[in-house]
Amino acid sequence: MVKLKETIQKAIPKHARVPLITVALLHSIFYWIPPLLTGGAYHRDFSIFVDESIPFLPFFIIFYAGAYLQWGFSYVYHSAISRGVCTRLAAADIITKVVAAAFFVLLPTTMVRPALDGGVFDFLVGIIYFFDEPVNLFPSLHCAVSWLCFRSAFSMRRELGGAYAWGQLAFSLLVFASTVFVKQHVFVDIIGGVILAELAWLASSHLPSEAVFGRLEAVFSRNKSNR
């Protein structure tokens, strides 16, 4: 346990811990609470003509599930490298989740999922379907968070290299495609998620996020030292 703690402390520097913990906690709150508030509400289906021509490709569950790895790696890696990017990314993420949660509650959406066959990838899709009901669709947080991974990488392209930043974009585009190919979202959800994340990223540059998280870090450090 001591070695594990030391490894985590090395991977996640002190300045990144409060922002990342805050992001993780708020994600759970803003994603899981809205369905409890809208259980009996009318849910709209935002499917359009484009969605009718999009096939069900269960193989893309690899990229859909891979998004979770992208988020975890990118948020920790980018935050560890730059305090400024860390706090801006956290602020953009929080803005995204707050606005998305408002949509989930005020404009609940749903969609029709396909019947699954017995293949391996269908089985994996079925696991996602079991744990993730067809709600909280617009805007797509899957697409929004992957876009923030790219935007934060692009902001550090001089430090990380252009190839890394464009690699983030390429993987994010595969994540976008996966959301409709595995029928977790409809096309409009992608557009909404990307626009929301981009606006949140732009807005975060005008917020004193570094100072705010710095104060929170000081408060937690003070409380810890007083124990």
Model-derived features with residue positions:
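N-terminal transmembrane-helix/juxtamembrane module of multi-pass inner/ER membrane proteins
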Residues: 2-71, 116, 125
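Hydrophobic, membrane-inserted alpha-helices
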Residues: 70-74, 147-152, 170-178
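Interfacial helix-loop-helix junctions of multi-pass membrane proteins
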Residues: 114-118, 134-138, 174-202
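Aromatic-anchored segments of alpha-helical transmembrane domains
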Residues: 28-32, 97-103, 170-180
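Membrane-interface loops
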Residues: 36-49, 79-163, 211-227
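Hydrophobic transmembrane alpha-helices
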Residues: 150-154, 197-205
